[in-house]
Amino acid sequence: MAKYDKADIERRMAGAVESLKSDLSGLRTGRANTSLLDPVVVEVYGAMMPLNQVATVNAPEPRMLAVQVWDKANVSAVEKGITKANLGLNPMTDGQTVRLPMPDLTEERRKELAKLAGQYAEKAKIAIRNVRRDGMEDLKADEKAKDISEDDRKRMEDEVQKLTDKYVAEADSAAEAKEKEIMTQ
């Protein structure tokens, strides 16, 4: 039984790029974006929950996020979760609504965020290369088990390498676009 599965390898590489794009969407630029609060977790009812399970997030103004907490008892926990997420936001409470004005990004903070985007991209590229390594190992195991010939293994290794190059390039371009967005806002 052959271990190598090209579709699985491509799916896992695409997953790494999607994860990168999700991470990058959480990086703050100058504008209010509800996805900025996606990584925020809140300690409520004795458990850690994503913010979107205890409140609604919207952007009423271009430079303001509003978090409408469903249960008034959770307002302080939501504030604490936002502060702990270290997003550089200063929550202001107004009843059951937590308002988050978007401060202007300093040049120093822009550089930090651009560097963080690069780190996220590197993490994604490592994941892609790990998938590549798994695929190459599966091909060698298939050849050893006489499921495929040496020529087939080499041809399939080339396919895996092409997929790797494609997804690494996608990761690079996503990170470059985010870095450009951060530095020009």
Swiss-Prot record:
Recorded GO CC terms: cytosol
Specify where the region named Disordered lies, as residue ranges: 137-159
Molecular function in Gene Ontology: ribosomal large subunit binding
Does the record bear Plastid in its keywords? no
Claim: Cytoplasm is one of the keywords in the record: yes
- Keywords on this record? Cytoplasm, Protein biosynthesis
Q: Which GO BP terms, alphabetically?
A: cytoplasmic translational termination
**InterPro entries recorded:** Ribosome_recyc_fac (IPR002661), Ribosome_recyc_fac_dom (IPR023584), RRF_sf (IPR036191)
- Show the Pfam families listed in the entry: RRF
**Family indicated by similarity:** Belongs to the RRF family.
Entry-linked HAMAP family:
RRF (MF_00040)
**Protein function:** Responsible for the release of ribosomes from messenger RNA at the termination of protein biosynthesis. May increase the efficiency of translation by recycling ribosomes from one round of translation to another.
Q: What is this protein called?
A: Ribosome-recycling factor
Source organism per UniProt = Erythrobacter litoralis (strain HTCC2594)
Q: What is the lineage of its organism?
A: Bacteria, Pseudomonadati, Pseudomonadota, Alphaproteobacteria, Sphingomonadales
